[in-house]
Each structure stands twice: as structure tokens, then as C-alpha cells.
Amino acid sequence: MNGATPGSAAAPAPVPDWRQFCELHAQVAAVDFAHKFCRFLRDNPTYDTPDAGTSFSRHFAANFLAVFSEEVRRVLGTAADTMEPEPAVTSVTSALKTATYGHSRSSEDVSAHVATKARVRKGFSLRNMSLCVVDGVRDLWHRRASPEPEGGATPKTTEPVSEPRDKWTRRLRLARTLAAKVELVDIQREGALRFMVADDAASGPGGTAQWQKCRLLLRRAVAGERFRLEFFVPPKASRPKVSIPLSAIIEVRTTMPLEMPEKDNTFVLKVENGAEYILETIDSLQKHSWVADIQGCVDPGDSEEDTGLSCARGGCLASRVTSCSCELLTEADMPRPPETMTAVGAVVTAPHGRARDTVGESLAHVPLETFLQTLESSGGVSESNNTGDEGAELDPDAEAELELSDYPWFHGTLSRVKAAQLVLAGGPRSHGLFVIRQSETRPGECVLTFNFQGKAKHLRLSLNGHGQCHVQHLWFQSVFDMLRHFHTHPIPLESGGSADITLRSYVRAQGPPPDPGPAPNTAAPVPACWTEPAGQHYFSSLATATCPPTSPSNGAGASSSSGSSSSATSVPPRPAEGPLSARSRSNSTEHLLEAASGATEEPADATLGRARAVENQYSFY
């Protein structure tokens, strides 16, 4: 019962399996460290992160290998070389059986065998056992991490002492360090968010949204994909519940107040398959930061979408960029005032439709400096828009309606795709080229689309009833003040940082074909009717009048702007534009106004009057 004595002649017991020995003590150390790790997190909650377990265990394993190697080297240097192995073998065998079947695996089991280890060293050849422990720890890491190629075969009892031990230790440390570095490089961003699928909001109890906690991971993928966005639900899950390649994301934007009235820090992801994910961050800074990072990976130049844009191949963009609700987009061709913007005789004409289905056509690029100089020389737009007695009767809302449609950089309801193609026509050489268009998704607002180093950027412009322009955190008295500011100051991009982008030139919108018009010194007739082609989406513009003039009649009030005037001058007549603004365009989607049946003439003393269209009529399909 007390084991064999040194003088006994009994047959030697079989040597226990070294793998079982390693696994036993590894489990004991792991259980002990796990309990202490959990206790440490409870005492220090600041370290309680989703990847805390991985970081702590890696650091523990690295230090374990270093301390283990040094301790084995120290013990082997001081231990005696003459030890009797047979009693030690019997004692260790009984100890292993007792620890396996009788007791729980804890640190006490390890301390129980301290007295036995000194007698075991010669029989077990601890110089080789160090290699076994290293190999066992490496196998445990292989089960948790990605598989790595095996470095060699199982060590034998006849191998050399020091060189294999040091070689295996160095190789294991180097392999784990390189793997960790590669993983950190592949991860672009990681954070804890809440998300829901847009379709799940109505399926919940009472129609409430089903929010879930997740760990969102933006990483560089393999096998051809540039980046992937992965949702880990729950956050500590080892495998993602949803994995989306960024090439399949067609839209990333912050939510509107009407979409999420009770949530301020949310943004939307729209995927090609029709799925929509709404994600919530803890503050506005994280929201804009996530949107900027995702857009930076999907943005033109970083994906197939922008490669097509930069090469002016618009066909590949139809499935990636949000398109206008009007498939057959046609716009009315508005005549643009000459650069001098001098008030001359005006002619009211019938609307002329223009279709811009081929964006690859050659359009003029006009320096913005020329427009601003002309604007300053003419004394501003208020005089040119309010000449005559009738202009004095306009309220501020009516004045705001006259500010966009009259100018060549405004392209109306040009779609997002075609606007991007226009500004990217010259590639990076057209840095700073811009157009202003009506927003497709937000009625009543406009979008500034510009070329940023060969990439198309879209900046939202909000206009109020007084003509004031709001761009992100900046307020301007008018759109022209905004153009002046961004002509000399860089545009603040959502991605932050210093952006060297100023507005340099604009794409001049196409005008209608030249019309013969009435002869000089002849008063221009006022049309009494409007003709609207069926199924056509257009702006109201002015061409040669085809309806006979009507007698003076009582027009509408000053706010309705239904009256129009004309005057005889000695200079050739110039087409004038009707009132058009983002606000009036948005209202037209709900109220389709009927054309006025008549018009009023201006008093004779108004020599330089400016005729305006009766009403704007739109139809959205």
C-alpha cells in the first residue's frame, strides 16, 4: 500500500501517458485561471469587453511559456542526475488515478504532487517533457484559433536536450505573434451596437421594433472580397449571424427624423437583396463615424461601383445606386440667362421638353469664378429677380422660388447616377466640378454633387422659405453665399479631417434649341393656355408663344404669382424663366395646380418688366 521501496525487485510499472499528464495539468491551470479571470472582471468592470477573454488568455499563455522554459532550465541545472525512477513511476501513476477519479481538478491537486515531482524528474525526463507541454498548449490554441500547419512530429525520448526546446519555444511565440498582427490588420473597425431588420418592426408584438444587441465587425475579407460587414449575435458569439459583403450594399445613410422619431443615433444599411438593417449607436459621433467608415469602403474608387463611375460606364451602376422613382426621366429645358444677367425684354413661351437619357454627351464646364464675378457686377440677384412693379409685391417665399431655376448650375430632377456621371466625366482632372440638383429622397431639399479626386460626393442642401441655405452645421443667407464660401474654403466632409476640396467649376445645364422669337420692337404676346405632354416629367420653361394674346383680366393675388407681363424694347427679346424652387417642387407632388386661363398686362410705366410663368406643373411617376 505504501508503494515499492528502493530495494524491491518488483517489475517496473508502465510509464503513464504524457499526453494525459499534460492535458490534466493544462485543465487544472485553465480552470484556476478562468475563475481568477472572472473575479478580476467583477472587480474591474472597465476591462469587461467582448474580446477580453481572448486577450487575457493569449497574454497568459505567452507568459506561461516564458516562465515555464526558464523554470525548467533552472530546475534541471540544479537537480541531481542520480534519481531512482521506479518508485516515482508508481507514485505518479497512483496520483494521476486519484486526481482523475477521486478529486476535482483544482490547484490543490497540483500542490499535492509537489513532493512527488522531485522524484519523478529522472524517470519522466523533464527536459523532454517541456517539449510535450509546449506541444499540448499549441494544440489547445489550434482548437480555438484558425488552424496552422504542424511544425514537426511528436518529440521522442532520445532527442537532444536544449536546442529542440528553444526552437519550439521560439517558433510558437513567433507564430502566435504573427497571427495576432494579421488579425488586427484585417479588422477595420469593431464595436457594440443595437440593430433590427426593417421588416421585423411590424412583426413584433404590437408592431414594436425588435432590437438586438450585436458586435459589428468591419473587416477585410478573403477570397476576392474587399471588405465584409459581420453581425455577431450575441456580441460574444464566435461566428457571425449575418455577413454582408460591402459590394452588396447599395446605400448607407443616417435615418431621417420621420423614419425613426424616437431614435436620434441610427443609420440604415440597404442591401441588394432588398434587406434593410437599422443600427443604433450610443451617440451621434459614433453614428457619423460608422457611416463614414462604411462609406469609405464602399465609396467610388474602392469598389466596382466607383470604378464604373470613374470610367464613365454608367450601365454598371443601376443596381448599386438609388435611382429616381421616375424611370423615364425627362426634364424641361430651361433657358439660362446670359452671364451678364442684364434685365431685358422678356417673352413668355410654351414649355419645351428635354430628355437627358444620354449623359455622356459633351456639356460645357464653366469656371465658378466667372459666375461669381458676373453675380457681383450685376449687383446681386435681388434686382434682377424683382424688377418692375410686380416684383415689389412678391413676398419672401416667392423670392426664394426664383433663385434656383434661373441659373446654369441647377439641373432640376437629375438623378443621382447621372449627376455622378456628369461630374466624373473628366476623372480626377475634374476635381471640384459640381452640379446642384433636386433631392430624390427628400422632397424640398437639394443636393450638391461634386467631384472629389475622381470620386462622386453628394452633400445635402436644406433651403427654408426665406432662401437661407443650411449645409451640415453651416448656415448661409442664400445659395450664392454658399457657393462663394465653398469656392474659397474647403467643404467639410462627413469623414472628417482636412479635405482639400473647393468648388472650381460647374456643369452648365443644357438650354433649349434657339427659337426665332418675335421680331424686335414688337411686344411679346402672353399665352392664355399651357400644353402638357402626357406622361412627361418636365420643368416649366419658356419658348416662343403659340397662343394668341388675351385681353387684360384680373389676375390672382400677389402670392399666387399668376400674372405675367411683357414690354416692347429695342433689343432682341430674351427668354425668361418661371419660378421654381425645391419647396414649390415638393408641393407639386401633392397639389397639381391647373393652368391659369388668362394673364394680366403690366402698366405702361414699367419699362423693364420680367415675365414669369403662370404656374409650374409636375407629374411624378
UniProtKB/Swiss-Prot annotation:
Query: Region Disordered: what ranges?
Result: 144-165, 507-528, 548-609
Keywords (A to Z) from UniProt: Cytoplasm, Membrane, Phosphoprotein, SH2 domain
Query: Under the GO molecular function aspect, what terms does this record hold?
Result: identical protein binding; SH2 domain binding; signaling adaptor activity; transmembrane receptor protein tyrosine kinase adaptor activity
Residues of the PH domain: 186-299
User: What Gene3D superfamilies does UniProt report for this protein, alphabetically?
Assistant: 6.10.140.110, Pleckstrin-homology domain (PH domain)/Phosphotyrosine-binding domain (PTB), SH2 domain
Q: Where is the composition biased (Low complexity)?
A: 552-570
Changes after translation: Phosphorylated on a tyrosine residue by NTRK1, NTRK2, NTRK3 and INSR after stimulation of the receptor by its extracellular ligand. Tyrosine phosphorylated by JAK2, KIT and other kinases activated by B-cell receptor in response to stimulation with cytokines, IL3, IL5, PDGF, IGF1, IGF2, CSF2/GM-CSF and cross-linking of the B-cell receptor complex.
Give the protein name, as stated in the record: SH2B adapter protein 2
According to its UniProt entry, this protein's organism is Rattus norvegicus
